């Protein structure tokens, strides 16, 4: 009986330990991608930790601890048990390379991200977004207007949405649309990929003037225009509007205003395609709830249920036509009510 109790206590402590190590693990992930450790293994050959340290300009003892940790915790590497200190890649490690999700991982775990979380307790206590208070700015939007931050943020979001873009091109038919407007489209990648698949369509990448001024080179296509503006004031005319990870930044009343603005410009028979998480109260998803907390802390907004989307659409003069479940985190297609 005593032995069983000891096992239970040990398992309980392991559970607690696994629950409280997120801080150090996320920071170690930042270090991993900052020094491009996964890239070192992309040739598929085993490496000693000394070789990895030399290539990444880190200390041998430090990189050994890093490799060993991620071999054990999330299976990024494998250590040769017959030649300890020699590691090789796994399929998971490739996800953390620069051409995959490294930029997103870095943005989520860099110094700025850690500072943003210092006031999370205030958001929970007050019920209002307090992220800006730990950063010395008036709002989260002021933060990303700082030199370099908006571009870094947009690049991170671009990487994180790759899977959604691929799925959208697979499961949504854009052929009926002649003019596709991507609201908050950043560099224009999404709408450009749509145009490549649908040669009879034209596109408009619509974003803030402040972003275009600091965005560097935008994606070019003879059938693509880049236009600046404010979606609370007006948007270009089109028969298809894309809202990818836009509405979750805003409270319901602001979402209604955005859709009302689109409603003034949308052509007859047009559609609005919304890419956002859909919270299912009967089957919660940890990733959705993580984003829900972040949106609350940053903006006072949230990830929404299908009921909320229905109410928002209805009040803005739209109706839900379809939920596309095949797309990661889901997608809604809405149109103007008759």
UniProtKB/Swiss-Prot annotation:
Residues that hold S-adenosyl-L-methionine according to the record: 184, 207, 230-231, 244-245
UniProt entry tagged with the keyword Transferase: yes
Pfam families, A to Z: Dimerisation, Methyltransf_2
UniProt record similarity statement: Belongs to the class I-like SAM-binding methyltransferase superfamily. Cation-independent O-methyltransferase family. COMT subfamily.
Gene this protein is translated from: omt4
Protein species of origin: Dictyostelium discoideum (Social amoeba)
Protein name: O-methyltransferase 4
Family annotation (InterPro entries): COMT-like, O_MeTrfase_dom, Plant_O-MeTrfase_dimerisation, SAM-dependent_MTases_sf, WH-like_DNA-bd_sf, WH_DNA-bd_sf
Gene Ontology MF terms: 3,5-dichloro-THPH methyl transferase activity; O-methyltransferase activity; protein dimerization activity; S-adenosylmethionine-dependent methyltransferase activity
């Amino acid at each position: 009986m005593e032995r069983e109790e000891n096992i239970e206590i040990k398992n309980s402590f392991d559970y607690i330990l696994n629950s409280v190590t997120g801080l150090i693990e996320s920071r170690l992930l930042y270090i991993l991608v900052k020094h491009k450790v996964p890239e070192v293994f992309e040739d598929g050959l085993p490496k000693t930790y000394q070789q990895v340290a030399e290539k990444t300009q880190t200390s041998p003892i430090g990189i050994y601890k890093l490799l060993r940790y991620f071999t054990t915790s999330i299976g990024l590497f494998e250590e040769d048990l017959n030649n300890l200190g020699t590691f090789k890649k796994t399929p998971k490690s490739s996800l953390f390379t620069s051409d995959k999700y490294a930029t997103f991982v870095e943005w989520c775990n860099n110094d700025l991200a850690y500072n943003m979380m210092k006031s999370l307790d205030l958001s929970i206590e007050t019920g209002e977004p307090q992220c800006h208070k730990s950063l010395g700015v008036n709002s989260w939007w002021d933060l990303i207007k700082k030199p370099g931050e908006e571009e870094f943020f947009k690049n991170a979001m671009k990487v994180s949405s790759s899977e959604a873009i691929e799925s959208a091109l697979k499961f949504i038919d854009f052929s009926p649309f002649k003019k596709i407007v991507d609201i908050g489209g950043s560099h224009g990648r999404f709408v450009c990929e749509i145009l490549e698949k649908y040669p009879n369509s034209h596109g408009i990448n619509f974003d803030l003037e402040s972003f275009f001024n600091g965005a560097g080179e935008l994606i070019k296509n003879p059938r693509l225009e880049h236009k600046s503006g404010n979606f609370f004031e007006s948007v270009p005319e089109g028969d298809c509007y894309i809202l990818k990870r836009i509405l979750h930044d805003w409270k319901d009343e602001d979402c209604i205003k955005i859709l009302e603005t689109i409603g003034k410009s949308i052509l007859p028979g047009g559609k609005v395609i919304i890419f956002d998480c859909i919270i299912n109260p009967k089957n919660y998803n940890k990733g959705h709830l993580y984003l829900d907390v972040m949106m609350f802390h940053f903006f006072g907004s949230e990830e929404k249920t299908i009921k909320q989307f229905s109410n928002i659409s209805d009040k803005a003069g739209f109706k839900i036509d379809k939920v596309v479940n095949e797309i990661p985190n889901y997608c809604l297609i809405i149109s103007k009510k008759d």
